[in-house]
Structure formats: C-alpha cells, structure tokens
A protein has these predicted regions:
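N-terminal, post-signal-peptide region of Sec/Tat-exported proteins
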Residues: 47-83
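Short acidic/polar inter-strand loop motif in beta-rich domains
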Residues: 108-116, 251-257
Length: 272
C-alpha cells in the first residue's frame, strides 16, 4: 500500500506541496549468519521492506537504541559504526564467549498521514484487523488518519555450541517479542511459545504473524495466530530455515496531534 510521509516541522500549507509517497515497510534484523563461532565478526543488516529485501535504509538520527546482549552484559553499539548506504542499513558485532546473543534496534517515532482509503488498505494488508474492524463498527471507514509509529526489532544469534538463557532478555522496548524457550534448543517440527509485550506488559489477543525462508531461499508460508490471556502466542516451526515473528500493536489516541499510535515488533532466528 502507499503512505504519505510528513515531516513534522513543515507547516500545513507546505505539506500540501511537499508530501512524499513511499511504500509501507516491515522491519527485520538479519545477521549474515545466525550460527557463529566464538571470537568472530558478524555483519548485520536491517531490512526495511520485507524479510528478503530492504527498500530504504534508516539514518542514524532515527535510532533510539542499538545494542547486543552477550553472556556477560548488554553492550551499546556505537552509531558511528552504523552504515546507511543505498537501501540497506548495516552494522557489525564482534562475538566473544559462547551463548545465545540478542541483537536489538529501536527507532524513534515518525509520523504519517493517510487518506481513508489508504489507511484502510494499510490495516488490511499489514495485519491490523482489529483497528479495521473498529473503524467499520464506528462508521469511520471514510475518515483519513494521522499515525505515530515506531519499530523495535531483535535477532537471536547462537555463538558457539552452548545455548544460554540470554535469549529471554527483555530489552525494554515499547513493543517486544520474547521467546519462552530458546529457539536454538529446538528442531524443525517443534513449537515455540513467545510472549508479546507492549510497554512491558503482556498483550492479550494480539495478532501475530510468522514465516521465513528455507536454506534454499524458498518462502515459508506466513501464518497468523493470536496471543492468549497471558500474552503468549504459540508457533509451529514446521521446517528448518530462518524465521521471523512480528506484530503491529495499534491503538486509538485521544488528545494528541495524531489519531493512532502503532508499535511494531519483530524477532528473527534460525531453526535447523
């Protein structure tokens, strides 16, 4: 679908002539390798588009947090090492001892304004059915919308041959997916439970989408599930490959300059 991106510093009159059009983007962290030796360097891509292709890079000023959880501590990544060349952002991590590392990137809020038609299409295509149904119920399908959005993405990397409990580290992002089990202790065909968090609290009945790619590059068909009363969603890891789990939590906002705020979360990992 199509979005109109609006810099907040512009006046209303200027907005009418300078609105830029861009595509909606999912966001994922995708290391060059998910299974990594100790004491090695790993290049990490931030995909801003789909799980297989980035369409736009993210500039440094949009970053709120870039960090990696190691077996000993959480280490901030110097944004001077952040590269935003072309359509893909990249950075590098340097592994030390064995364990399950957590990589995280959190972006600052941005704003969009959409026509009613574009907003409804966005809700339908990007997996936000509850807001679409609320607009239908309340007779608001014909209303345009202003939205504040921010995205918070993680990747799990297995360093060496000893999985650790660090996979469950909560980074404190506004939206976050936290595995209940370590994916690197599971095999293809297993199920994985994940907790959906918004502002640190479990989200009931959150719409969650998951999928991925096999080692050959074939798509793993996306599936959707709902979180339970404890905010936990259960996923069927049907095949070996690189997997993603994602959700978009959108809520109506009152007494603000926007109508809605959305908080995006994703996590990626590999299953063998």
């Amino acid at each position: 679908m199509r979005r109109r991106w609006i810099p907040s510093v512009l006046t209303s009159a200027l907005l009418l002539t300078t609105v830029a059009v861009a595509a909606a983007h999912d966001m994922f962290l995708k290391p060059s390798r998910f299974f990594v030796p100790e004491n090695s360097e790993v290049m990490v891509r931030l995909l801003n588009g789909t799980f297989t292709r980035s369409e736009n890079s993210i500039a440094r000023h949009r970053l709120k947090d870039v960090s990696v959880v190691t077996p000993t501590r959480r280490v901030p990544i110097d944004t001077a090492e952040w590269s935003a060349e072309g359509d893909t952002s990249t950075f590098h991590i340097h592994t030390r001892g064995a364990g399950t590392y957590v990589l995280g990137v959190s972006t600052r809020p941005s704003f969009i304004e959409l026509s009613a038609e574009d907003f409804n299409l966005y809700l339908r295509e990007d997996g936000i059915p509850d807001v679409l149904e609320a607009r239908r119920r309340d007779g608001e399908l014909g209303k345009p919308a202003r939205e504040r959005y921010h995205k918070h993405v993680k990747a799990l990397v297995q360093v060496g041959d000893r999985p650790s409990d660090h996979y469950a580290t909560v980074l404190g992002y506004p939206a976050e997916i936290v595995p209940i089990e370590n994916p690197y202790t599971l095999k293809s065909g297993a199920t994985l439970a994940v907790k959906t968090l918004v502002d640190g609290k479990p989200v009931v009945n959150q719409h969650v989408i998951y999928g991925g790619t096999t080692a050959s590059g074939a798509a793993i068909e996306a599936r959707d599930v709902r979180s339970d009363a404890q905010g936990i969603a259960t996923l069927a890891l049907s095949t070996a490959g690189t997997w993603y789990v994602k959700f978009i939590h959108m809520a109506r906002v009152q007494g603000d300059t926007v109508d809605y705020e959305s908080k995006w979360a994703s996590v990626t990992f590999e299953v063998r």
